[in-house]
Amino acid sequence: HSIMLGYSMLANFGAKPFETDNEIFGYYQYDSPKFKAYAGVIPRYKEIGDYPSAFLSDSVRYFDPNLTGLLLQYQGGRGYVEFGCDWNSMITNEKREKFLLFSAGRIRYGLFYAGYHLTMYHHAGTYLEDGVVDNVLIHPHVGLDLAEVARMEKLSVQAGWLQAFQNDRKYVGDYVTPGGVQIEAHVQKWNFGIHNTFYAGDNLMPYYVAPFDNLDYGPGLYWGEPFYRTDNIYDRLEIYWQPVRTSLMNLRVSSVHHYDGHKWGWQQKIIFTVNLGQNRIFNKK
């Protein structure tokens, strides 16, 4: 049993460190060989589910690095499962009531594995403007991991189906069910890697910018990459170099390419992290 405290600080280029929303976070942690539990304001890196960018965009991971609520995890010899609740906002006259339930699991059998990702986002109204939007996204998938037999750092291919169920109870009153296939391939050797994600299907974010009054919910409702608004294809190619990978430090330099079937975009990323360890303020066994 332990209680952890920390401080999350963000500084944008050209801005002073304390001009952005920074927060003190703390959480309770229970740790056993197979089961872990967290409660409080929890860093997202504690999640063990590898949620695709359709669920969490780079921007969400960067600008909202903590979840507020509960995280439960079980890890066995052949797989894992986790469940969490992230309470984003309590209802007021100006703020919506919002919370996210999420889960992920995976089981391995030899070189093959099967798993799922699941989120249910409750996006309600304010005291002055009622209404609720339900946003459910599920991703069952299967994969083949050949890294060990090929003596590679990473070598895998994965195929799955992204299925959404969305209902604006007040303004629509019925579910829309966009979906599509997603295929991923990942290869890494000598700290150089390529990770490609290909999606073909419907617009997974029909209410992001909608042709009706009151339905433009944007990133407040959708946490995934906005490229999934495509009604054609979306391909994300990341080429990266990871020269430093230790328990203390990690450095990754990436060139990320986006193509939505019409236009191409380019993104550059440099991520450097230092793990200072977990200093326990309170400990009970």
Q: Residue ranges of each PLM-predicted region?
A:
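Outer membrane beta-barrel
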Residues: 2-88, 197-199, 203
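Exposed, low-structure sequence patches enriched in small/polar residues
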Residues: 25, 76-88, 94, 100-109, ...
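Short secondary-structure transition/capping segments
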Residues: 50, 93-96
